[in-house]
Amino acid sequence: MTTELQIGRVIKSHGIRGEVVVEVTTDDPDIRYAPGEVLHGRQTGREHTLTIDTARAHQGRLLIKFEEIPDRTAADSLRGTRFFAPPLEREDDEEGFYDHELEGLRIIHDGADIGVVTGVMHGPAGEILEVELTSGKEVLIPFVHAIVPEVDLEAGTATITPPDGLLDL
């Protein structure tokens, strides 16, 4: 079974010609959102297969026109659609992680298992790990080397060295 990654989400329609605003969640938008690429989307109970006609940057997001979407009304119906694709081939020495690789990792602090990564948030300043502590409390941990110096995918762990108070928030 191939793991699919979420590569974007339709935020809203844009203009009257059927463009949509897409929040991109991939490091390779030039590949994933190239004209002619076929995207597979899911939206509450529906699936879409859409071919990209044009894609252009707009205010930190992409404006995409699909061949199958003729107007704003059709574009409005795509709101909330999430696009998925299989992972791209990576070089063995390439840095970085896919969200699905981080989700489920056990969090280790001072040698103790203190929780598990339940999700990854993407923001303008970088990624943030959503962690559920063994106490049941949820915390957010910036995914930066100073705080998460080691990720061992084979062991299924991420070691953290949080500043004082981070886990108490």
UniProtKB/Swiss-Prot annotation:
UniProt superkingdom: Bacteria
Function: An accessory protein needed during the final step in the assembly of 30S ribosomal subunit, possibly for assembly of the head region. Essential for efficient processing of 16S rRNA. May be needed both before and after RbfA during the maturation of 16S rRNA. It has affinity for free ribosomal 30S subunits but not for 70S ribosomes.
HAMAP family linked to this entry: Ribosome_mat_RimM
Gene Ontology biological process terms, A to Z: ribosomal small subunit biogenesis; rRNA processing
Domain PRC barrel: 94-166
GO annotation, cellular component aspect: cytoplasm; ribosome
Assembly, per entry: Binds ribosomal protein uS19.
Cellular compartments annotated: Cytoplasm
PANTHER family: RIBOSOME MATURATION FACTOR RIMM (PTHR33692:SF1)
NCBIfam families cross-referenced by the UniProt entry: 16S_RimM
GO MF term (any one): ribosome binding
Annotated gene: rimM
Pfam families listed in its UniProt record: PRC_RimM, RimM
Protein name listed in UniProt: Ribosome maturation factor RimM
Family as reported in the entry's similarity comment: Belongs to the RimM family.
Keywords linked to the UniProt accession: Chaperone, Cytoplasm, Ribosome biogenesis, rRNA processing
UniProt free text on domains: The PRC barrel domain binds ribosomal protein uS19.
